[in-house]
């Protein structure tokens, strides 16, 4: 019985993905800009300082800040932000403009 040839992983010919740290930084900046439209900048500064005191300048800290800001924005929109149709009665469904099949 002949031995099977060793498995060789395929060569990765795709373009290299952008670095994780750069992607996290871009996402954090986008969420921060959106949060500044809806929350007091002093609150966001205090939150950033709190996260920094717990995690320092790490990816874990950036991830934690992203998670908290996403939740805060979601709850803010659900509560009826005046800039959003989410959570408001009569706001309408944005998908209703798509004709049915």
UniProtKB/Swiss-Prot annotation:
What Gene3D superfamilies is this protein classified in?
6.10.210.10, VpR/VpX protein, C-terminal domain (1.20.5.90)
What is its subcellular localisation?
Virion; Host nucleus
Which keywords label this protein? Answer: Activator, AIDS, Cell cycle, Host G2/M cell cycle arrest by virus, Host nucleus, Host-virus interaction, Modulation of host cell cycle by virus, Phosphoprotein, Transcription, Transcription regulation, Viral penetration into host nucleus, Virion, Virus entry into host cell
Q: What are the transmembrane regions? A: none
Q: Name one GO biological process term.
A: symbiont-mediated arrest of host cell cycle during G2/M transition
| Superkingdom field | Viruses
Main location class: virion
A Pfam family hit: VPR
Function recorded in the entry: Stimulates gene expression driven by the HIV-2 LTR. Prevents infected cells from undergoing mitosis and proliferating, by inducing arrest or delay in the G2 phase of the cell cycle. Cell cycle arrest creates a favorable environment for maximizing viral expression and production.
Q: How does it assemble?
A: Interacts with human UNG.
Record protein name field: Protein Vpr
Q: Please name the gene that encodes this protein.
A: vpr
